[in-house]
Amino acid sequence: MKSILFTHQGPHKVHGAFARTVTKNWYRYGDNQPEIIKNLIKSVFDRKSYDVILVEGGLGLPHAVLKKIKHPETKIILLYADTLLYDLPKMNLLKRKTVERLLSYIDGFIAISPLNKRIVSQHYHNKPIYHVYPYGSNNSFEIDCDLESHDLLFIGNHEMCKRFDLLVDAVKILNDRGYEYNLYLVGSCVSKIDVDYPWLHKEGFQEDLNKYFKHCSLYVHPADFDSCPVTVFEAMSSGLIPIITNNVGESDILNESGLECLILKNNEPEMIAEKILQIGNQNKKWKNYVSLKCKEISSKYNNETQSKLFKDVFYKLLDEI
């Protein structure tokens, strides 16, 4: 029986559920620079060795690589669910070379979406790469959203690659033309928005999302890049119709489900505004059909199915490294 360590930064609820299927040994490496450095220094004196280290995200690589240097037989599997490889070309030379050096120690990848898998494949086509979609952990299948409302929703943190700022600009375009839309921003994204409008509701972090799922009609996520935000699955569970870019992980699912009309060609504010109107102006029968299909899609990606798939993929990958 192989000894497996899961190193994490929290972890994300879904990633934790995945990890539980393969190990009970967990180690928190930290979610901020001071904590990561402190734990890295402490790990220098840690003599424990493991056959496999499953790493949640790129920030955990220094700790895992240090263990591999001390115990070269250790295998590292990266649960790739962040923007590390997307950000790589934009890094300064020193940082990029450091990250590339850390990445070279990885033996295999489990990406959180085909989008992330494609990015990994561009850099590491000679290493085993699999993908397993996450799932919504705050689903609301009992709710039927108000498909006729002009209330729009975005949920996310303050990472600017999510481009909630462009969504604000898009809704301003619509309201300047006489349309009466409200935009609800939930999460730390609000810290990056300095403008104020009567129609812009900066909600911040919220424990209960149901009140937004009940009265909104569209969930808009116009990211430059977002691996596979579970908020898309969660919004769809209440029947909200998503509008996303091709660079959001769920875009492959929408394309495969015949819902390519919900994918933005680009995330320019004018294009976002046009897509909101296009979907919002559809007849009730069409919106009901799409809303129900969104619920069905969301229900397919759940804890049981995805955790089992992760376990299967993990051990399949182990056989290859």
Residue ranges and their predicted role:
Residues V44, N92-F109:
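Membrane-proximal helix-turn-helix segments that form the acceptor-binding/catalytic region
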Residues V55-G60, Y80:
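Short His-centered aromatic/hydrophobic patch
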Residues D107-F141:
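Donor nucleotide-sugar binding/catalytic pocket of nucleotide-sugar-dependent glycosyltransferases
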Residues D144-K162, V168-V171:
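Conserved donor-binding/catalytic core segment of Leloir-type glycosyltransferases
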Residues F205-Q206, Y212-C216:
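Short alpha-helical donor nucleotide-sugar binding micro-motif in glycosyltransferases
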Residues D224:
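Aromatic "clamp/platform" in nucleotide-sugar-dependent glycosyltransferases that forms part
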Residues I241-T245:
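Short hydrophobic beta-strand element within catalytic cores of glycosyltransferases
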Residues E256-S257, C261-P269, Q278-K284:
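Conserved acidic donor-binding segment of nucleotide-sugar-dependent glycosyltransferases
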